[in-house]
Structures are given as structure tokens and as C-alpha cells.
Amino acid sequence: MTEIKFHRVLLKLSGEALAGPGGSGIDLTTVKRVANELAEIKRAYPQVQIAIVNGGGNLWRGEPAAKAGMDRARADYIGMLGTVMNALSLADALEQAGVVTRVLTAIEMRQIAEPYIRGRAIRHLEKGRIVIFGAGTGSPYFSTDTTAALRAAEINADAILMGKNGVDGVYDSDPRKNNEAIKFAELTYDEVLRKDLKVMDSTAGAMAKDTDMPLVVFNLNEAGNIQKAIEGQDIGTVIKGSK
């Protein structure tokens, strides 16, 4: 069996990654595909512990709503509810694939999910359950990228795996718009900031750098890439605190 590099990971999924070809809403076929891939990983490597933070941009974006005149905090809270909708959809697909799953939310909604408690989250992971963190950090103005950096540090993850929608790593410009865009195999967080590469927002990047958390950016749309990232195969771009 292939050796694995990361034993406890935080998988960051954008909301758009669950939207499928339509680009918005929840595409159940796409959700099922992601869930089945995660289930295969758990069967192949039962010792691997997987936590997930998903975005909500397929359902709502707080910042544009605020620019349109809505109260920013309220707009962000709506976005947090969107992440819970995505989390519940993914949890259902995982359960149907035979994986025991727990959804923990930063805002209490006990009828549908457990409240986020760090020790409880770690205990679920140790028992082999996939843990999905919903509702962001529970506070407005913080992105789900920041949530991923925060939760990864809290659960002592070995790495953040950032699945991108159709982009296989970090480039010096948008490869979908520039055919001559150059892909980076490895970067430091300082280089990401200096080159103004749009990997994650500055708050998330600063937290990941401060906690020296490795980040693997890869194409989620290519089947098997989550497992390859866990195994440490040479896919995507690896970002570290230092060379």
C-alpha cells in the first residue's frame, strides 16, 4: 500500500466546487462524486482523519450583498447559513456512501448539527468519523478560508488541502484567461503575499503562516486528487511557512 504523508487533514472546499456545471446552487451529482471519493479514501486508509470546511459562495455571497446596501454583518450571517446547507448536503452523501459523519457548527443549531467544541471535534476524528465544520467562524467579516486556517490549527492538522474548481494549482495569473500563465510547484506564504497571488485572503494566509501549516492547492475536479494529495504525490502547488 502507498505510504501516506498526511494523517490528519483539513479539506477546504469552495461552495462553487459543490455547484457543478451550473456554477450555483447545490448539484447533488457533484456532491455525491466528492463524497464517494472521500469514502474510497476512508476505506483505503482508515487511519486517515479528515475534517472539512466548505464555503457557501454557490448559494450566497455576503460582500456583494453589503455593497448593494445590505448590513454587512447580516449578509455574512446569511452566508454562514449557506455553508451549513452545503455541509448537510455533503454529510448526507457521505452517510449514504457508508461514512459516519458529524456536522459541527460555529453557530448553535442543535436540531440539525452539533455545536463546535474543539475537543469533541478531535474525538470524532479519532473515532474515524469525517467532521464537517459549518457556519464559518461564527463571526461576520471572516471568510471560510480563514475558518479553514483556524480549524486546521485547532485540530492540529498536518495540512490544509484546498480543492479548486478546475484549477490545478497556483499560477502567476489566471490560467483560464492567460494561456502563458506560469504554475508554481512550491511557494512560501511570504512569496504568496509578495507576488499578490490570489490563493486565500490575507487573514487566512497570515494565520496559516503563523501556525506553519502546509497548504496543498489542487484541482478538485480530477478524480483521485484528494487521495493523491493525502499521499503527498506531486500534484498542484505546495505552500509552506518557509523553504
Curated annotation (Swiss-Prot):
Keywords: Allosteric enzyme, ATP-binding, Cytoplasm, Kinase, Nucleotide-binding, Pyrimidine biosynthesis, Transferase. Its EC number is 2.7.4.22. Gene3D superfamilies: Acetylglutamate kinase-like. It is found in: Cytoplasm. Residues 20-25 are annotated as: Involved in allosteric activation by GTP. ATP binds at residues 12-15, 57, 61, 165, 171, 174. It catalyses: UMP + ATP = UDP + ADP. The keyword Disulfide bond does not apply. GO terms for cellular component: cytoplasm. One of its GO terms (molecular function) is UMP kinase activity. UMP binds at residues 56, 76, 137-144. InterPro entries: AceGlu_kinase-like_sf, Asp/Glu/Uridylate_kinase, Uridylate_kinase, Uridylate_kinase_bac. It comes from the Bacteria. Allosterically activated by GTP. Inhibited by UTP. Pathway: Pyrimidine metabolism; CTP biosynthesis via de novo pathway; UDP from UMP (UMPK route): step 1/1. GO terms for biological process: 'de novo' CTP biosynthetic process; UDP biosynthetic process. Pfam families: AA_kinase. Belongs to the UMP kinase family. Catalyzes the reversible phosphorylation of UMP to UDP. PANTHER family: URIDYLATE KINASE, URIDYLATE KINASE PUMPKIN, CHLOROPLASTIC. This is Uridylate kinase. The lineage of its organism: Bacteria, Bacillati, Bacillota, Bacilli, Lactobacillales.
